[in-house]
Structures are given as structure tokens and as C-alpha cells.
Amino acid sequence: MGREYPLEKFRNIGIMAHIDAGKTTTTERILFYTGRTHKIGEVHEGQATMDWMAQEQERGITITSAATFCKWKGYAINIIDTPGHVDFTVEVERSLRVLDGAVTVLDAKSGVEPQTETVWRQADNYGVPRLVYVNKMDSTGADFYMCVNTLRDRLHCNAIPIQIPIGSESEFKGIVNLVKNEAIIYEDDLGTVMDEVEIPGDLKDEAEKYRTELIEAISELDEDIMMKYLEGEELTEEEIISAIRKGVISNKIVPVLCGSSYKNKGVQPMIDAVVDFMPSPLDIPPIKGTDPETGEETDRPADDNQPLSALAFKIATDPFVGKLAFTRIYSGIMKSGTYVYNSTKGKKERIARLVKMHSNRREEVDELRAGDLGAIVGLKDTTTGNTLCDEQNAVVLESMEFPEPVIHVAIEPKTKAGQEKMGIALSKLAEEDPTFKTHTDQETGQTIISGMGELHLEIIVDRLQREFKVECNVGKPQVAYKETIRKTVKAEGKFVRQSGGHGQYGHCWIEMSPSEEGYSFENAIVGGTIPKEYISPIDEGIKQASETGTVAGYPAINFKVKLYDGSYHDVDSSEMAFKIAASMAFKNAMSKADPVLLEPMMRVEVTVPEEYMGDVIGDINSRRGRIEGMDPRAGAQVIRSFVPLSEMFGYATVLRSRTQGRGVYSMTFDHYEEVPKSIQEKITGEKK
């Protein structure tokens, strides 16, 4: 089977934006106009084709990146519709890694919003070329020119309008195409009847101004155009398109378009712009990887005749076929029914079937070729970020990095029978989502789930109930405190019991002192005051007793013990008696050694725009945080600090409201530190 579309006619794009800017509606319209759907799905009616999880249809937001394939004027377009909510940033990150271009959707009345900044930064990291579509031009307060200014001011990009609107708010009825220098007026509700007319008289000056701006912007990128422009020659449409394309692919300019997806205006010209200006797989540099044998860097050009290289960028569970591995093919051909080598894990896997996805509908195909996006059925060991390749020409592509979870809660099934079911379900969900983690707390025995925010974990619990039929109780997160000592003391432990027949006798003296890290035990017994066989039980007894300290019953850490004296009884002494004596000695010693409570300190980095810095620093200080330093980063500041974990619960929500959603933070465990006296008293009071 040959290639249906040549590689230069391929476009792999993502649609990204702030929540509620109209991404999913825009994608629905693209599918309608390219003939993929015969009925338009409305998000607010819960019918959108791309929002296929029950939670998405209920909440009207996109949680997972739905992938779909469509055709337009002889071009093949793969589209990924990504979520705009900050808790689902991982989905955006995954998509950008495998896309060649992106359409950023703005709300015409809001311009650049917080999550727009976040996804823009992510796209910058991957060098993804972009164009901007200003949506909702029909809504009250719509302002196209304000949007262009926010792009320039807040994202520091070279935003160049290639269209301007005809009218706005309820009067919005079409666009001026600055490339063709003509107007498009929409005549019907479905947007399929358009009239290409002369630019209205009252817009001629405005159109001339922005067309000149466009020509000047592209002439700076192309010497031939510069010469023609300076000599006053008229540029052809082809020359302008070619120059804009060059500027977009090199990330030097960002074309700005406008429309109203809901009112079916401006969508087809936007699809034209995707075809005209977005790169094909041949326009972007070959994917880089490492040879697993030699460790040398190698690259794989987009070509069917090259050895196979592909990246699994998302794992999803399909109710009918099981595990789906969404994959981008960078080079070579992947065939159904063959084996593929997972070079990340060093394992061979069999491809049962290959499918192209249309949201959650599958179309089976025999092969996927360079540039394709598709899903594989049958891979057992492959996880997000794994490389799939030809075993004889192995390569490991650069994997994806995901942020650590920032919020944790305890969860338990409502019934005993649900325990095993919940374990299986959680491991499946963790396989799908690299930012969702689950573990069992060794101290409380509780199952702890961790994720990117409250909404993220809500959706996880919701999916447990809907997809896996596991009803759960969700608790509040708890902090794992520890205890330690501050001075060296000596203490005795003596266990004597006479109750007819055999008695019990164990007796020891220990010296307990603070230590830098962990626990150590030294046997300093001389002259056999305690026989050798009882030394190990004494060590064991101390270790067991240290699991519940004397301050508030939390585990004791960072101390050392020297066993230096004691006594025994020929008949009554036993291992158990010495174990009990040792635990008594530990309790006596710890209570005299100035014991204190320790709390986990988190290394917290907050990235915020300058104007919110004072507010955020004040908030960190109020949480008993210590500011370690600040670094400037692309129009923002990174505040580095240490903050107690107990003070960080609910921080994501607070930061979001204090910075209008423009602040982001990361949090990792760093070390344990002494709890202030007043807080210690409060915690011990609660424990009692």
C-alpha cells in the first residue's frame, strides 16, 4: 500500500488555548467543514465529538487530548484538541512534543489569558510554530486589536494580522483577507455560503495600514521581497504566502486571524492558513535520538525509506480494545501484525492492530508511515515517552519530562471487596497519566493518590467510580511528621517478671545521642555482662520502639545508641525479655533527651509575573516559608523558597486566585526540620 498523501501535504497541528476560549468548538467546525462530521456538535449541549469522556461532556471542558484526522484541499491534517485547564498541563506538554505546529485560540474579549501564557511557554520550549485565531468576534466586548496588542505585550511575539474583522460584536459579518486584499462576507448561518467582495469603503484605510505592516514584516525576512517592496513593485499572492510560511516555520512571525467558530464565520480561511503556513514534517529538523549501543547522537529524517522510529506520547484505555498507545511516526513504516522494538525498555512488542483515531472512534489501518499520528493496540509494556523502532537500527528518542504531583489525598474503597479492584484501577490510571501517582503510606497503611491539582484528583476519583465501578471515600491529606532528640543521655531498661515457673529477666543500660542521619547501634559490652545472643534482640527492640516516638507517636529518626552495661539471669533471661528491656530503655532515654518534632520541608519554586511578586512573597512568609532567592525568567520572576508541607495544602488554589491564574509552582521534598514550639504543642494536642 503506497502513501495516500505526500509528506509535504501533511500537517500535524494542535489546538491550544485558555479554558473557554472556544478550542473544542473550533475543532468541531474544522471537522464539519472538512467533511468529517455531518452534524456540528455543540460543547454546551454536551455533544462535541472531541469531548468524549463523560466528565468532559458534563463539565464542558476538555480533559484529554483527543486526536483526529481530516482532509482539506488535497492535504491531510492530524489535529489534537488539548485541554486549557492548568491541572491538565501534562496533556498539552505531551501533544506539543509530537506536533509540528499549533493554532492558539484567543477569546476576542479577553485576549491573552493565564493559561495562554503557560501553553505559549510550553510551545516555546519545543520550538513549535504558531498562528493565532481570535475567536468569539461576535461576543459583547470583542476587540481584535486589543488581542493583537496583548500578544505583543504579554507573549513578546511578533504578532502580525493577516486578516482584520468586518464589524464586531453582533455586527460581525466577515473578514478582510490582507494577503488577497479582498473581503469575505458570510451569508448563511452555517458559514458555507461566502461572498468574496471588494473591501468595504469604511475599512479601506485600515486594511491598507495593516497590509503595509504585513508586507514590511515579511520583507525583513526575505531580501527579494525587501527589494521589490522598496522599488514599489506589487507582490504576488504566492510570494506573500511563501514569505509568511518561511517566517512562521522559523518562529519569526505569528500570523493573527479572526472569526466566530460558534457562528460559523472565519473557520475555512483558518484551515487554509493551516495548510498555507504550518510546516509539514519535511519542514522541521529531523528528530534527534541516541544510539543505545554507542551512546552517540543520531537523527532520523522524515522519510518512509529510513528505519522505523516512533514515540508513544500517550497511553489510554479503550473500553473495547483495551490499551491504546498513541504514537507519532517520525521515520520508516509501522505495519500491523509485526513486531516492534521498545528501545527505552529493551523489549520486543507485537503490534496487534493499528488505528487512526477520530476522537474516540477508531478506523483500522494496515500501516502508519513517517509523519503519521495513530494508535497501536496490543503493546503491553510501552508507557508514555517510550521509543518504538526497528531492532536492527535501534534509537532512543528524547523522552518527555513531566512535573511532579503537587497535591496528595488519602483514598479508600467503601467496601472491603473494592480494595483489589481499586488497586488495579489506580495502576491503570497511573499508566495513562504520568503526573498521577499512587502509593501506600507505610505508616498509616492508607492509599495515597497524588496529582496536579484538586480538579485533576476529582476527575481521577470520578473515573474510578464511572469506568471501574469503585466507590471511594476521599480523606484530607496528612503530613508525615518525624521525631528526634537534641542531647546525649543515659538510661536504663529493666524487665523482670516472676509468675511461677519460668520468669522473665532483661536489663540494659544505653547511651543515646543525636546523629546526622539515620540510626546506628554500637555494642560496647565488655566482660560478658550481657551474653552475645541477647545483643541482636536489644538492637531489634530499640528499632521497633523507635517507630513510635515519645512526643506525639511519630517515628524517631537521626539518633545513635551505645549499649554499655546491663545484667542477665541464667534461667529467666530470654530474647523477648531483652527486647522489652531495650524498648523501655529507649522510651526512658528519649523522654529525657530533649525530644522534638520534625516536619518535611518542601523546596518550592513559584514563577509569577513581576506585578504579583510582593503578594506572593508575603503569602510564602505567612506560611512560615523562607525565601532563598529570586531569578528573572522571560517577563516573570522565579521565587525560590523552603516551606513546610503542612502549610502548602490548598496552595494551588490560593496562588491561582492571587495571580489570576498566571502563577505556576513546583514543589519537591527537600529535608526535615524542627517544628516551632507553638506548632509542636498544637500537633501534640491534636494527637492526644
From Swiss-Prot:
Keywords of the record: Cytoplasm, Elongation factor, GTP-binding, Nucleotide-binding, Protein biosynthesis
Chain ranges of the tr-type G domain: 8-282
Short name of one Pfam family: EFG_III
Main location: cytoplasm
Location in or out of the cell: Cytoplasm
Residue numbers binding GTP: 17-24, 81-85, 135-138
Function: Catalyzes the GTP-dependent ribosomal translocation step during translation elongation. During this step, the ribosome changes from the pre-translocational (PRE) to the post-translocational (POST) state as the newly formed A-site-bound peptidyl-tRNA and P-site-bound deacylated tRNA move to the P and E sites, respectively. Catalyzes the coordinated movement of the two tRNA molecules, the mRNA and conformational changes in the ribosome.
Protein name (record): Elongation factor G
Organism annotation: Clostridium kluyveri (strain ATCC 8527 / DSM 555 / NBRC 12016 / NCIMB 10680 / K1)
